Regions:
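Active-site/ligand-binding loops adjacent to catalytic centers
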Residues: 1-28, 71-153, 158
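Generic beta-strand/beta-sheet core signal
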Residues: 10, 31-33, 57-59
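A short, acidic, amphipathic alpha-helical segment used as a generic capping/interface helix at domain edges
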Residues: 12-17, 22, 36-47
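Flexible, glycine/charged-enriched surface loops at secondary-structure junctions
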Residues: 26-37, 50-53
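Catalytic phosphate/nucleotide-handling subdomain of diverse soluble enzymes
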Residues: 39-93
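Long, compositionally biased intrinsically disordered regions
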Residues: 164-165
Length: 166
């Protein structure tokens, strides 16, 4: 969280679309597991100026290397609706909707503030801390890219953790 400005997700169908596009354009054949960040970068790049740089981090790579068609056939055989259409209609566990056009690929923002609060909540839960000092407060503020006053407010008001020394 310390270095994140934004956290986005994409739909499965969009990843399959990018995987196939990469195979068609570059002749690169690999499974979609490594192309999740590529799909997000593709969507974000469409909104950026030519001279801007995008940095993406793949959060999951299985190295499975499965061909995407095998995965889509497996999904179909297990009752998943696999079709072309609007990826926004995709429902996890029910459907994989592959875009009909590259413009349909979108990055969907997750609420970073919610993730940051969850991070603090997990720290409190796992450590069972009831009080933190100023240096710990400063560390947490840097860790989640918030001011010390914001972190103090969250810790005291939402998690009943006392912040001592100022």
């Amino acid at each position: 969280l310390r270095y994140m400005d934004r956290y986005v997700t994409v739909k499965q169908g969009e990843v399959f679309y990018i995987t196939e596009a990469l195979a068609q354009v570059e002749g690169v054949e690999r499974g979609p597991a490594g192309n999740t960040s590529l799909a997000a970068a593709f969507a974000l790049a469409q909104t950026m100026d030519e001279d801007e740089i995008i940095v993406v981090q793949e959060t999951e790579y299985t190295g499975a290397g499965k061909h995407p068609y095998a995965q889509l056939n497996f999904a179909r055989e297990n009752g998943i609706d696999v079709r072309n259409g609007d990826p926004d209609e995709e429902k996890p566990g029910e459907s994989v909707i592959i875009p009909e056009h590259p413009e349909q690929i979108k990055a969907r923002d997750l609420d970073l503030d919610k993730i940051k609060k969850s991070y603090l909540k997990n720290i409190v839960k796992k450590t069972e801390v009831k009080e933190i000092n100023q240096s710990e407060l400063e560390f947490l503020a840097e860790e989640i890219k918030k001011s010390t006053s914001e972190v103090k407010e969250i810790m005291e008001n939402e998690f009943e953790v006392n912040v001592k020394g100022e």
